[in-house]
């Protein structure tokens, strides 16, 4: 079986000096290798082809046959690494907490320990007839959530 760490090192070599970042590498028991990369401005097919060829040049099919798939992390897919949070700051995201609560808001900040989302909620001021929309910042530790993903809007 092909070692995931070997593939990760090869991808890291290719990424040096580029604005792309590695999201995930998986290697199945039947040697299907899946590499996911991302970029602040999107992933171009030409770069996926270039990375695929680079990986193929470093692995020996004669020694061990494999299937290789290189692509983008995919819009609307849950974030897997901090860089994905960072490139989506200022954009709408959907969060599902481990308690099963789903929230939508604007990603405000992210760091190694947690991230902050600004949500809008209705609050009825005392004596008012109608509730008003107010913004609230909520900070989550990564282990408090099941997923965070970019919210695709067709407005």
From Swiss-Prot:
Keywords of this entry: Cytoplasm, Ribosome biogenesis
GO terms, biological process: ribosomal small subunit assembly; translation
Gene Ontology cellular component annotations, sorted alphabetically: cytosol
Principal place of residence: cytoplasm
Pfam families reported in the protein's UniProt record: DUF150_C, RimP_N
Location of this chain's protein in the cell: Cytoplasm
Cited function: Required for maturation of 30S ribosomal subunits.
UniProt similarity note: Belongs to the RimP family.
Name of the protein described by the UniProt record: Ribosome maturation factor RimP
Classification lineage: Bacteria, Pseudomonadati, Bacteroidota, Bacteroidia, Bacteroidales
């Amino acid at each position: 079986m092909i070692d995931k760490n070997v593939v990760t090192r090869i991808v890291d070599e290719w990424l040096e000096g580029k604005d792309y970042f590695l999201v995930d590498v998986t290697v199945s028991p039947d040697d299907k290798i899946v590499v996911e990369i991302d970029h602040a401005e999107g992933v171009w097919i030409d770069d996926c082809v270039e990375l695929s060829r680079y990986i193929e040049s470093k692995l020996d099919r004669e020694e061990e046959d494999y299937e290789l798939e290189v692509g983008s992390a995919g819009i609307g897919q849950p974030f897997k690494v901090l860089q994905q949070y960072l490139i989506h700051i200022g954009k709408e995201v959907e969060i599902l907490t481990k308690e099963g609560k789903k929230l939508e808001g604007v990603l405000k900040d992210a760091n190694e320990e947690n991230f902050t989302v600004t949500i809008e909620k209705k609050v009825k001021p005392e004596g008012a007839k109608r509730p008003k929309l107010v913004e609230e910042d909520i900070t989550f530790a990564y282990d408090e959530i099941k997923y965070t993903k970019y919210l695709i809007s067709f407005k």
